[in-house]
Amino acid sequence: MKIKYMGHSAFIIEHKNRLIIDPYIETIPEVDYVLVTHAHNDHFGNTIEIAKKNNAKVISIYEIAEFVKQFNIESIGMNFGGTIDIGEKVSLVPAVHSSTLYYNGKAYPLGNPGGFVIKGNKTIYHAGDTMVFKDMELIGELFKIDVALLPIGGVFTMDIDQALKAIDLLKPKIVIPMHYNTWPIIKADPYEFKRKAEEKGVEAIVLNKDEEIDL
């Protein structure tokens, strides 16, 4: 599996399919599926444009999946505990946050926020926007996480210290920070996070925008 960081909380995961998660990006990459953790605009991003350009399916919580159908986009709605097999197994798990889309001057509350676990030859957990919560321990037990993508910017999500606690609960082999330094309000030092994570014996990788790793 390959992971490419697209900035903020956006990643492209490549295995049998090419998946993009939370596409708050300026480009329209070639993908097969668009995964949306929640409806906030810095995660929903240009989901509509990417899905239409690629004839890609949107995978998200049921309410978001239903919302995009008005744009003639195919979608797969899920809820917590659900798993689908698209060549990779995609599971929707909880997050502790909120989820409202602001679109064309209107506010659309669109279900609960979540995270995704994607299983190919490795297992990747994208936490979405969240604080640390005790059930991360259960997510780790159920899925045996190889790589955890964790927000560290604080204010709207967990900060570095909470993300370090999330490592204790999830027990991943590798962690990659996200959702930081996009704006001054979520300023954080990813290398502080890397140093402290590695003091726990967990490999931490700081990816620059457009940088890719092969697992």
Curated annotation (Swiss-Prot):
Q: Which domain of life is it from?
A: Archaea
Q: In its keyword annotation, does this UniProt entry include Isomerase?
A: no
Alphabetized Gene3D superfamilies for the sequence = Ribonuclease Z/Hydroxyacylglutathione hydrolase-like
One Gene Ontology MF term: hydrolase activity
Q: Which InterPro entries match?
A: Metallo-B-lactamas, RibonucZ/Hydroxyglut_hydro, UPF0173, UPF0173_UPF0282_UlaG_hydrolase
Sorted UniProt keywords: Hydrolase
Name the family. Answer: Belongs to the UPF0173 family.
Name of the protein: UPF0173 metal-dependent hydrolase NEQ378
